[in-house]
Amino acid sequence: MSGNTFGKIFTVTTCGESHGDSLAAIIDGCPSNIPLCEADIQLELDRRKPGQSKFTTQRKEPDEVKIISGVFEGKTTGTPIGLIIKNQDQKSKDYSEIKDKFRPGHADYTYFKKYGIRDYRGGGRSSARETAMRVAAGAIAKKILKHYGIEIYGFCSQIGSLKIDFIDKDFINQNPFFIANKNAVPACEDLIHSIRKQGDSIGAEVTVVATGLEAGLGRPVFDRLDASIAYAMMSINAVKAVSIGDGFDCVTQKGSQHRDEITQQQGFLSNHAGGILGGISTGQDIIAKLAFKPTSSILQPGKSIDVQGNDTTVITKGRHDPCVGIRGVPIAEAMLALVLVDELLITRSYRD
């Protein structure tokens, strides 16, 4: 299987399955002498890990990361950084009834058609469990970006039809929904409770922002910065759409409204472009929005076929998120960090 490595200079290769022994990653191209310890990475993993609230999956994985190479006396050495996380709360028996069935809306069917074999336990390699290593790698990328004054944060901006206004950035990590609005918590709780009672799931929108960037990151034509961001975000499980800046709202805007005018004293007067023009950063905040589909693992029966092509019905057991977009926030942050640190290193190589 190819397609397990991301990046050009700062590269991340992941391996592991949902119910396998471990998850692992190799991060290559990291500059030397970056202060790094397991606690730095664990802070980010703890934001993503399952089983932290009644609003996400009840699979309880500690996601304790171990650095096995590339760090000496608390600093990166410039050699490949090896990371490993042991899976500890697998319940593979929950999936025994679907080992010969394809769950509708999942990658079961396509993996089987491509490889002629699949790990049916929790989706195997196609499971969002894989994203734990992305978040771990993203934690390292964030440390590098911080050195250059670049900060990344994300938040859940919509759950189902419930749009959530951005009020307080500091509140994002103080609630289980990663929302920036304290007043919206009760509505989010009621919505998720209602969805769970129905044995169903719901989609979500996640917004991710990068601040403190200089102008000039990114390359034309096929390596545009916004193209790289979209590529990274679309690689996240359950993401079905990505927009930059005003995104699809630009369809109804006029040019006189959408163009981001500039003055000598005030700089850019707006940021409809989301911090990117011509595939290159403007120095403004980079803003991306991701649409997460509702998970297909629900308690309601659905029509499908088995490996012999016979009609069947599937009811998914196991422990699943009623809204996968909630835990998608730290994953989106990690992928944006990986894109930006790679582009930063590429830009430095051009200038050097």
Curated annotation (Swiss-Prot):
Identify which cofactors the protein needs according to its UniProt entry. FMNH2
The record ties this protein, via Pfam families, to: Chorismate_synt (PF01264)
UniProt keywords, alphabetically = Amino-acid biosynthesis, Aromatic amino acid biosynthesis, FAD, Flavoprotein, FMN, Lyase, NADP
Per the record's keyword annotation, is Methyltransferase included, yes or no? no
Pathway assignment: Metabolic intermediate biosynthesis; chorismate biosynthesis; chorismate from D-erythrose 4-phosphate and phosphoenolpyruvate: step 7/7
Which transformation does this protein catalyse, written as a reaction? 5-O-(1-carboxyvinyl)-3-phosphoshikimate = chorismate + phosphate
EC code(s) of this entry: 4.2.3.5
Comment on bound cofactor: Reduced FMN (FMNH(2)).
InterPro entries assigned to the protein according to its UniProt record, in alphabetical order: Chorismate_synth, Chorismate_synth_AroC_sf, Chorismate_synthase_CS
Q: A cellular component term (GO) from this record?
A: cytosol
Question: Subunit comment for this entry?
Answer: Homotetramer.
User: What is the name listed in the Swiss-Prot or TrEMBL entry for this protein?
Assistant: Chorismate synthase
Lineage in the entry?
Answer: Bacteria, Pseudomonadati, Pseudomonadota, Gammaproteobacteria, Thiotrichales
The primary gene name is aroC
